[in-house]
């Protein structure tokens, strides 16, 4: 039958003029259906994928438990190392203090503190080993509880999440805290055993040094310290008109030395000889001036023989000048044949100098010895005898206004100074020898403590695997109802698996944890007395754990700075320098204090790092899932059983934290704890088993069968 052309055009969906109204409506309906279908698919996928976020959160929560445990391990390591360093450093400071008589009481306390800190280190090592092992064994439960708690906390709007975490590796060997090296114990015992001998040697050296110090002070006063009163410097300026360059003045005995006095005397006599003049024109005045010149010439020659040698030892020669006639007779002044001789009658006459009126026409010369050996006449003009020359020295030696008086006191003091140093040298030398050996022992012991550290490879050290499931009923079109897409039933169970591993976080948090340790002891009144001396050292030793050798050097310097090192013998300063030098060569390396933070990774990476049956099963399941996607649900039947066996443990009670160990020093105690996840308070081991059962039930509801392990 033929259709009229007009009617055919009315029912056409396409013509040369475009689409009809019916065609447009159909196209719009198809487009809207596709849009809403795509949106529905996206929503279903989005809702389903939330379980992966929960699995990730559970893995991170479980990883945080392991990270917290590693903080405790590092704290225990820092305590063990710092207590060893504190013990050895305190012992070294005690040895230094024993070298100073005024600090020997402090030295005894420091030596005792060193021994008691070592005992505390031994006690801490035992409790830390037990405590860390106990917490390590609880890590699987703690991690599982934390993951399960996070999963439950995310349940809302119809979602019902369950998660179970497994640590890789799932177990670890007990943690051992190494005991100190035998060298450290031997070094402390030797220091304590030889302390009394070092004290006695230091006392003898100090007594000798004090005598030497007193002699030097007296010499300084007689040389220039008494200025503007009478002294060598004042007399040299007044009598010989010496310049400041020839006649220096020192304000402190510490800056002065015996060589200053000797050089002053060596410059004085030539200068004094150059300015010597008779008091008047009388024969007696001229004779006395001539004899003074004779004495000054002799004195200049004698003093020029003097020397002062200072360095490791002291040696000096201050030639003594005659102070009276008897002493003059023992010098070359008495034997010098330099005086003119005149003969009047049968007896010769000796004259003081060539200018004597009675010496005119003399043809020979003789000495005072010659005069006293024969029956010689005394000159009626100059009256020259041996006593005349003896009085020249006596006049300036016996009273304080004479240069020779002060020079003689310096010469005597130099002899006393040298004698005292020589008497103290053996004791000082022996003390240095003993202290050097003891400090070398402590240095060697400090060098070895770095090898006795605490290390751990706990469960979860390589990573965490978390299984999560959402069994809550959730309509496919919930919140997105539409007439374009018809939805019925509920979304099925959504499952996911995630993994996390620990990575370093250089944020400085690890350093803060270590630094806060000392605060507990620093404020504890139980540390007063003996152990108070070691508290500051321990703070420095903790810094050495973080910063290495530089902090150890600073701790030693600070400890030395608090000691009473002032001593005449100088043993205290020497021992302090020796201690610093010895510990400077220890070569302590800083520990890695980067905090650990969990980060999500591919589960294969974690599984490959473990060698347990669970890891092998997980890798095999992942391989099969890739090869046979439809069998991927077997991950739960294969894995959950292993998790359940490894995690399920029963604990009687939990608090906010677990105590790993306690630092106990002389009554002061600082606990080292591991914070527990909040979930542990109300999350018993039964909940872990229930979570595993629920996961297996999910698998049964999907596959129609239940596998029992």
Regions found by a protein language model. Give the residues of each.
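Long, compositionally biased low-complexity segments
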Residues: 78-346, 385-709
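Mature, structured domains enriched in cysteine- and short glycine motifs
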Residues: 334-390
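Alpha-helical assembly-interface signal, strongest on the long, hydrophobic N-terminal helix that forms
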Residues: 2-92
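Generic low-polarity alpha-helical segments
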Residues: 1-11, 58, 347-351, 355-356, ...
């Amino acid at each position: 039958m033929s259709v009229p052309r007009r009617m055919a055009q009315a029912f056409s969906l396409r013509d040369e003029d475009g689409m009809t109204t019916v065609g447009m409506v159909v196209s719009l309906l198809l487009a809207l259906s596709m849009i809403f279908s795509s949106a529905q698919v996206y929503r279903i996928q989005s809702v389903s994928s939330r379980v992966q976020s929960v699995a990730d959160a559970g893995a991170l929560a479980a990883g945080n438990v392991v990270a917290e445990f590693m903080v405790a391990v590092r704290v225990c390591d820092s305590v063990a190392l710092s207590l060893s360093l504190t013990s050895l450093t305190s012992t070294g400071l005690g040895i230094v203090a024993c070298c100073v008589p005024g600090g020997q009481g402090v030295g005894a306390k420091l030596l005792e503190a060193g021994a008691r800190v070592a005992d505390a280190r031994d006690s801490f090592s035992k409790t830390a080993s037990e405590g860390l092992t106990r917490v390590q064994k609880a890590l699987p439960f703690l991690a599982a509880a934390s993951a399960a708690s996070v999963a439950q906390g995310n349940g809302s709007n119809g979602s019902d999440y369950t998660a179970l975490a497994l640590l890789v590796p799932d177990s670890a060997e007990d943690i051992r805290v190494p005991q100190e090296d035998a060298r450290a114990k031997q070094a402390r015992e030797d220091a304590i055993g030889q302390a009394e001998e070092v004290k006695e040697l230091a006392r003898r050296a100090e007594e000798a040094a004090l005598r030497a110090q007193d002699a030097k002070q007296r010499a300084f006063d007689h040389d220039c310290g008494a200025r503007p009163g009478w002294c060598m410097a004042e007399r040299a300026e007044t009598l010989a008109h010496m310049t400041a360059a020839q006649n220096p003045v020192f304000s402190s005995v510490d800056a002065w030395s015996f060589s200053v006095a000797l050089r002053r005397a060596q410059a004085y006599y030539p200068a004094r000889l150059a300015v010597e003049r008779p008091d008047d024109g009388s024969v007696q005045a001229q004779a006395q001036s001539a004899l003074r010149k004779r004495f000054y010439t002799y004195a200049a020659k004698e003093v020029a023989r003097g020397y002062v040698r200072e360095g490791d030892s002291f040696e000096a020669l201050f030639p003594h000048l005659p102070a009276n006639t008897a002493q003059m007779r023992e010098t070359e002044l008495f034997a010098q044949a330099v005086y003119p001789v005149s003969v009047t009658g049968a007896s010769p006459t000796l004259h003081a100098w060539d200018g004597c009126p009675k010496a005119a026409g003399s043809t020979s010369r003789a000495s005072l010895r010659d005069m006293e050996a024969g029956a010689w006449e005394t000159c009626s003009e100059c009256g020259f005898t041996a006593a005349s020359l003896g009085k020249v020295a006596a006049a300036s030696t016996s009273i304080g206004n004479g240069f020779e008086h002060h020079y003689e006191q310096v010469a005597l003091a130099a002899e006393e100074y040298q004698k005292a140093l020589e008497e103290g040298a053996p004791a000082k030398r022996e003390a240095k020898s003993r202290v050097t050996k003891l400090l070398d022992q402590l240095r060697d012991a400090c060098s070895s403590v770095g090898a006795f550290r605490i290390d751990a490879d706990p469960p979860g050290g390589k990573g965490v695997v978390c299984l999560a499931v959402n069994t809550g009923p959730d309509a496919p079109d919930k919140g997105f109802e539409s007439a374009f897409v018809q939805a019925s039933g509920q979304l099925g169970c959504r499952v996911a698996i995630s993994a996390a591993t620990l990575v370093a976080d250089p944020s400085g948090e690890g350093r803060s944890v270590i630094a806060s340790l000392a605060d507990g002891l620093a404020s504890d009144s139980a540390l007063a007395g003996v152990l108070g001396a070691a508290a500051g050292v321990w703070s420095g030793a903790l810094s050495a754990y973080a910063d290495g050798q530089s902090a150890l050097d600073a701790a030693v310097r600070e400890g030395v700075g608090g000691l009473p090192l002032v001593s005449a013998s100088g043993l205290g300063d020497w021992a302090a320098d020796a201690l610093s030098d010895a510990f400077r060569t220890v070569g302590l390396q800083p520990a890695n204090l980067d905090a650990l933070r969990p980060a999500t990774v591919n589960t294969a990476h974690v599984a490959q790092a473990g060698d347990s049956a669970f890891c092998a099963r997980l890798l095999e399941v992942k391989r099969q899932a890739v090869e046979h996607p439809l069998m991927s649900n077997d991950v739960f039947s294969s894995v959950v059983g292993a998790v359940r066996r490894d995690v399920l443990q029963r604990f009687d009670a939990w608090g906010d934290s677990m105590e790993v160990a306690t630092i106990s020093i002389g009554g002061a105690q600082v606990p080292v704890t591991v914070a527990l996840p909040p979930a542990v308070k109300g999350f018993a081991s039964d909940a872990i088993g229930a979570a595993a059962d629920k996961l297996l039930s999910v698998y049964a509801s999907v596959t129609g069968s239940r596998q029992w392990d």
